[in-house]
């Protein structure tokens, strides 16, 4: 959706320039290691200094590559009504990503299954606030690793007609994702002209990219598909114990990845990604439910605008191990930071617990409510004739009320947010059952799944997808 409220810039122009200059110095004097010979060959071809696996990128090279990256692009869904524009004034929400565990209502934790993935794909498909339906929402531990990405992709396609993410687990799995997308949309030539996949490419901080991520990045760039180039620097452990230094380190890694993508295929849709946070000095754990993480979210959105590319950051981020007040207030802080500062692509919007390690059905429903509230908040005020409401104010006059006015019946659904989870009833009504938020969320996700009907998928395309997945299973020895 388009964002109507003005974006908040947390950094001054001078501070942005200081980060940029520090970043250029890192890239030129320290360099980045790329553990993948095809990537090193690209940089050699581009005239950049390569010593072993370390690449030194000049300011002129990086700045020229940024110019070829689109400021915004459309990601296409199999249902065109669900296409999303990434960049500009738009904000796109999608569920959590990469979690190997599920937290149950009773607080217990278990490994994720393919059924969990399918359930989250359906919940995302049913949500009016989630714009994408899947990536690696809940990585199924009951599926062999070699075919896990295939089953997740198929589940995303089968259970929703929204946009979805491709696998970033190396060159072959990225190519599998492209092949599946080509089957779904009618050929590789078709999807090269209109991107249908977005994938998450993470640096290996500090100042490295590994073979797995580089292989995926290059495969997607060659196919014309979108890539999020992301860095997760943990201030105090994988990054310096200063926020500006950590931001500079993150910026260097992201710009290096963007430069590679643009060198392979100029115009490749890229998204500037950040999940940088800190390492808690007491436990050593990653802390994403922290004010420092919210600061990185805010600054990353501003840096992306400075470089003229879309941004990815934020989400319902928290460090809690259960669906409690901590999960709520930390998630609201990081989601609000993303909204107010103009982040375009918000991964991990719904369901995440324990610093990316787990998903929760109840948390998904609670985060979906937060997302709905924030989308409404970002619409701001309406200033047309109905919005100004002079006529009805004049009609009611001093001491009257507006409940029975036609203006109220006409405008309240447009102007007011109606919650799907929050309880606004009178105390006596609430006291009959005294349900806590997570108990209401538990009932709601079960109701959604019971009533959800996945959108139809063309039987011929479905058969081709299943045949490809079966063939790939044989080839990797995991039928």
Swiss-Prot record:
Its EC number is 2.1.1.376. The keyword Transferase applies. Pfam families: MTTB. One of its GO terms (molecular function) is methyltransferase activity. The keyword Repressor does not apply. It is an enzyme of class 2 (transferase). Keywords: Methyltransferase, One-carbon metabolism, Transferase. Induction: Highly up-regulated during growth on glycine betaine. GO terms for biological process: methanogenesis; methylation; one-carbon metabolic process. It comes from the Bacteria. In contrast to a small clade of this large protein family whose members have trimethylamine:corrinoid methyltransferase activity and have a genetically encoded pyrrolysine residue essential for catalysis, MtgB lacks pyrrolysine and uses a quaternary amine as substrate. This is Glycine betaine methyltransferase.
């Amino acid at each position: 959706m388009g964002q109507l409220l003005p974006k908040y810039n947390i950094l001054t122009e001078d501070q942005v320039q200081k980060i940029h200059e520090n970043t250029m110095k890192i890239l030129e004097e320290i360099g980045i290691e790329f553990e993948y010979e095809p990537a090193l060959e690209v940089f050699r071809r581009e005239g950049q200094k390569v010593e072993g696996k370390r690449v030194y990128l000049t300011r002129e090279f990086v700045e020229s590559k940024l110019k070829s990256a689109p400021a915004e692009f459309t990601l296409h869904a199999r249902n065109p009504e669900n296409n999303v524009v990434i960049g500009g004034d738009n904000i796109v929400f999608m569920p959590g990503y990469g979690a190997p565990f599920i937290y149950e209502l009773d607080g217990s934790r278990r490994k994720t299954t393919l059924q969990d993935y399918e359930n989250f794909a359906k919940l995302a498909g049913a949500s009016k606030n989630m714009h994408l339906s899947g990536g690696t929402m809940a990585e199924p531990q009951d599926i062999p690793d070699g075919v896990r990405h295939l089953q997740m992709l198929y589940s995303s396609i089968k259970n929703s007609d929204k946009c979805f993410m491709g696998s970033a687990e190396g060159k072959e799995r990225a190519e599998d994702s492209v092949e599946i997308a080509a089957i779904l949309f009618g050929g590789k030539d078709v999807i090269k002209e209109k991107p249908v996949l977005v994938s998450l490419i993470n640096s290996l901080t500090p100042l490295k990219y590994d073979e797995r991520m580089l292989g995926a990045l290059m495969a997607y760039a060659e196919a014309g598909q979108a890539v999020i180039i992301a860095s997760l620097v943990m201030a105090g452990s994988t990054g310096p114990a200063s926020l500006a230094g950590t931001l500079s380190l993150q910026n260097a890694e992201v710009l290096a990845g963007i430069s590679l993508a643009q060198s392979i295929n100029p115009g490749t849709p890229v998204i500037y990604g950040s999940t940088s946070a800190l390492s808690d000095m007491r436990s050593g754990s990653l802390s994403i439910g922290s004010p420092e993480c919210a600061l990185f979210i805010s600054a990353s959105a501003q840096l992306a605008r400075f470089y003229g590319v879309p941004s990815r950051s934020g989400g319902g981020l928290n460090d809690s191990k259960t669906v409690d007040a901590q999960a709520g207030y930390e998630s609201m802080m990081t989601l609000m930071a993303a909204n107010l500062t103009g982040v375009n692509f918000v991964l991990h919007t719904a369901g995440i617990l324990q610093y990316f390690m787990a998903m929760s059905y109840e948390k998904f429903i609670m985060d979906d409510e937060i997302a709905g509230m924030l989308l409404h908040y970002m619409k701001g005020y309406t200033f047309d004739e109905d919005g100004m409401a002079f006529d009805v104010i004049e009609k009611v006059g001093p001491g009257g009320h507006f409940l029975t006015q036609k203006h109220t019946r006409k405008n309240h659904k447009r102007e007011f947010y109606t919650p799907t989870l929050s309880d606004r009833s009178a105390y006596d009504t609430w006291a009959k059952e005294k349900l806590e938020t997570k108990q209401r969320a538990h009932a709601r996700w079960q109701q959604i799944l019971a009533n959800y009907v996945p959108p139809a998928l063309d039987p011929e395309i479905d058969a081709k997808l299943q045949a490809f997945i079966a063939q790939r299973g044989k080839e990797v020895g995991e039928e």
